[in-house]
């Protein structure tokens, strides 16, 4: 049992050391405070040039970490991205509309060209339909006028009957 616990203990120890070393390197915890950097133990050679360069390096590190605290994204960049997305979508929409209009114009030309090849039968048919409807309407009006004259008693022996026959024949 003791032989099994040593590898498990080593694995757990390795895991914790990795987690703790990574958690100290995360920027989520913020830059190291100046109090922690300045509270170092002074060694014998505190006035050495190495200590001065080390302090300068720590100042550079603090400035770099402070700059990294700013958000990664920029608001103006997001606005430009939104403008770009809108422009591309709008251009695509205009392209689709122009393609649709072009297609409709081609279809319209095809239909109009087939009509222009043989316009006489189409015109004859429409004229015949109009004439038929107009004749039917005039006959209905003549019948209505005749019935009104009969019902109102205004019928004369010679006046309305010849007109009625003439209107029915038209």
UniProtKB/Swiss-Prot annotation:
The modification Asparagine amide is found at residue 152. GO terms for cellular component: extracellular space; neuron projection; neuronal cell body. Gene3D superfamilies: 6.10.250.590. The modification Phosphoserine is found at residue 76. The modification Isoleucine amide is found at residue 107. GO terms for biological process: adenylate cyclase-activating G protein-coupled receptor signaling pathway; epinephrine secretion; learning or memory; mRNA stabilization; negative regulation of apoptotic process; negative regulation of potassium ion transport; negative regulation of smooth muscle cell proliferation; positive regulation of endothelial cell proliferation. InterPro entries: Glucagon_GIP_secretin_VIP (IPR000532), VIP/GHRH-like (IPR046963). Transmembrane segments: none annotated. Residues 1-21 form the signal peptide. Keywords: Amidation, Cleavage on pair of basic residues, Glycoprotein, Hormone, Phosphoprotein, Secreted, Signal. GO terms for molecular function: hormone activity; neuropeptide hormone activity; peptide hormone receptor binding; signaling receptor binding; type 1 vasoactive intestinal polypeptide receptor binding; type 2 vasoactive intestinal polypeptide receptor binding. Residues 22-79, 156-170 form a propeptide. It is found in: Secreted. It comes from the Eukaryota. Pfam families: Hormone_2. Glycans are attached at residue 133. PANTHER family: GLUCAGON-FAMILY NEUROPEPTIDE, VIP PEPTIDES. PHM-27 and PHV-42 are two bioactive forms from proteolysis of the same precursor protein, that cause vasodilation. PHM-27 is a potent agonist of the calcitonin receptor CALCR, with similar efficacy as calcitonin. Belongs to the glucagon family. This is VIP peptides.
């Amino acid at each position: 049992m003791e032989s099994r616990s040593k590898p498990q203990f080593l694995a757990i120890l390795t895991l914790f050391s990795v987690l703790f070393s990574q958690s100290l390197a995360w920027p989520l915890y913020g830059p190291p405070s100046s109090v922690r950097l300045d509270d170092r133990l002074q060694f014998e050679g505190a006035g050495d040039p190495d200590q001065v360069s080390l302090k300068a390096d720590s100042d550079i590190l603090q400035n770099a970490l402070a700059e990294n605290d700013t958000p990664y994204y920029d608001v103006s960049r997001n606005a430009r991205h939104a403008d770009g997305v809108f422009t591309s979508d709008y251009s695509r929409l205009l392209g689709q509309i122009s393609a649709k209009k072009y297609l409709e114009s081609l279809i319209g030309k095809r239909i109009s060209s087939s009509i222009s090849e043989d316009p006489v039968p189409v015109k004859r048919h429409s004229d015949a339909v109009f004439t038929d409807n107009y004749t039917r309407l005039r006959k209905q009006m003549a019948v209505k006028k005749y019935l009104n004259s009969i019902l109102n008693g205004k019928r004369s022996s010679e006046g309305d009957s010849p007109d009625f026959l003439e209107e029915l024949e038209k």
